[in-house]
Amino acid sequence: MELIVSPEPALKIERRAKLLSVTFARPAENNTLTQQTLNELSRAFDDAERDPACRIVLLEGSGGYFCTGMDFREMTSRSTHDQRSTGDIHYMDLLRRIATTGLVVISAVDGQVMAGGIGIVAASDLVLATPASRFSLPEALWGLLPACVLPLLIRRIGFQNSYRMTLTTETMTARQSLEAGLVDELADSLDDAVRRRSLRLTRLDQETVRRMKAYFQKMWYLSDATYETAVNEIEPLVRDPRIQENIRNFVEHKRFPWEKIG
């Protein structure tokens, strides 16, 4: 008889009164986003939205990492002939859900946020961060673009700030991120900041928040076509043999594209 071992959960989920705490729980892997992680996030939002008492979803990291984007090991295992990357579609669906759900989504950041993690932060309703937190979009170093991140990031911090992050791939401090509008509040104690914000936010019902988000989205350029454009832009890049090789060399040898072999 073959023993089937279930994978360890990618998320730690805890209910606190009217708040659902969702913690990225793969710090040894820098809290990257795997298909398993995306599936668990989808189920967590399903459960929270079905609960009429729930008002807030709190997203947190662990081990010095909030979230560092798509998992490179999983990405390199995809066939270059895949017609559509399921992971990219599910990631885009996650960002859309955060931006439209009737729940208030708070990202509480204590550590590093990179790549797709920036998209989660940008889509969130409120972003709280400790002074030690850092934010970056390093995709261009491997020949990729943060295509799925940018619609939400531009909405939050504007065109030039988003373009600068994408072009330079430089890391922004928590203070710089606050000044750019990516972070809403710096706090030494995230627990205290969340508790203070929750006192008023838990008084809003889900339908009010849903209508609020829907109306604000009408005031911006986000649409089904925008999201589709983002996914269509990233798909040929993740299938490109050159980019696949760049990522594979980094995964297997910790070698960046500009570093020559031997």
Predicted regions and their residues:
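Terminal low-complexity tails and localization/encapsulation signals of metabolic enzymes
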Residues: 1-7, 248-262
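Conserved CoA-thioester-binding segment of acyl-CoA-metabolizing enzymes
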Residues: 1-62, 199
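Glycine- (often His-adjacent) and acidic-residue-rich active-site loop
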Residues: 61-97
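Glycine-rich beta-to-alpha active-site loop
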Residues: 95-142, 171
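Well-ordered beta-strand positions
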Residues: 126, 164, 168-170, 185
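C-terminal long alpha-helix characteristic of the crotonase
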Residues: 128-133, 183-228, 258-262
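Hydrophobic, secondary-structure "cap" segments at the distal end of domains
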Residues: 150-160
